[in-house]
């Protein structure tokens, strides 16, 4: 951690180099926040992370429910497909999406980056929600159906409230993962 503390201390250095501490100053931070291009990149990065995490959480939640309700032999196949993006290196995934988008003549920009971030965030959400689904008591679902609940009512009244902590955790994991793999757009 020494290099991190060193950088933090010298961020407040009035001098222009990191050889000698010449006095306390916030000028480097002032220069940082005066750079409008950097602020724009920061805003775009957080917006992209927010939006991609939201979409990935919606898709990943219903994907996890689908995997959970699938037959055992299909569950393994779906989980294997889901895990491909988790084990593949980020550079390979990025290059694959670039090839896909250019081959499909999809314009590169915010939407292509958003689609890529959603695609590599979905597996994280699925992996956060599936364990919670497996902990769920199947008798609650059966009881809801026995009492006349429709599939939508069971989902809304039983399953989603039970999954809420895992859904929130999945969202924040996807958000963090998206922030980690930020991209400059435009």
Task: Describe the residue ranges of each PLM region.
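Transmembrane alpha-helices
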Residues: 1-4, 126-129, 137-138, 151-180
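Short membrane-interfacial helix/loop motifs at transmembrane-helix boundaries
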Residues: 2-36, 186
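Transmembrane alpha-helix signature in integral membrane proteins
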Residues: 12, 36-67
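Membrane-interfacial helix termini and adjacent extracytoplasmic/periplasmic loops
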Residues: 26, 91-120, 152, 185
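Membrane-helix interface segments
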Residues: 37, 69-78, 105-111, 151, ...
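Residue-level signature of the transmembrane alpha-helical core
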Residues: 42, 46, 50, 54, ...
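Hydrophobic alpha-helical transmembrane segments in multi-pass membrane proteins
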Residues: 48-60, 90, 94, 124, ...
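Cytoplasmic-entry segments and transmembrane alpha-helices of multi-pass inner-membrane transporters
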Residues: 62-97, 141
């Amino acid at each position: 951690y020494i290099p991190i503390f060193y950088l933090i201390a010298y961020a407040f250095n009035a001098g222009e180099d990191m050889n000698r501490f010449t006095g306390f100053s916030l000028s480097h931070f002032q220069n940082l926040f005066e750079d409008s291009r950097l602020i724009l990149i920061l805003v775009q990065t957080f917006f992209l992370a927010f939006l991609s995490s939201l979409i990935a959480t919606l898709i990943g939640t219903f994907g996890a429910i689908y995997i959970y309700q699938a037959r055992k032999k299909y569950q393994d196949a779906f989980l294997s497909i889901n895990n491909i993006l988790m084990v593949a290196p980020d550079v390979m995934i990025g290059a694959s999406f670039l090839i896909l988008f250019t081959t499909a003549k999809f314009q590169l920009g915010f939407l292509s980056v958003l689609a890529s971030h959603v695609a590599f965030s979905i597996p994280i959400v699925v992996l956060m929600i599936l364990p919670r689904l497996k902990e769920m008591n199947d008798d609650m679902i059966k009881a809801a159906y026995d009492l006349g609940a429709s599939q939508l009512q069971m989902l809304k009244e039983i399953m989603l409230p039970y999954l809420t902590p895992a859904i929130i955790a999945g969202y924040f994991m996807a958000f963090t993962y998206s922030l980690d793999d930020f991209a400059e757009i435009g």
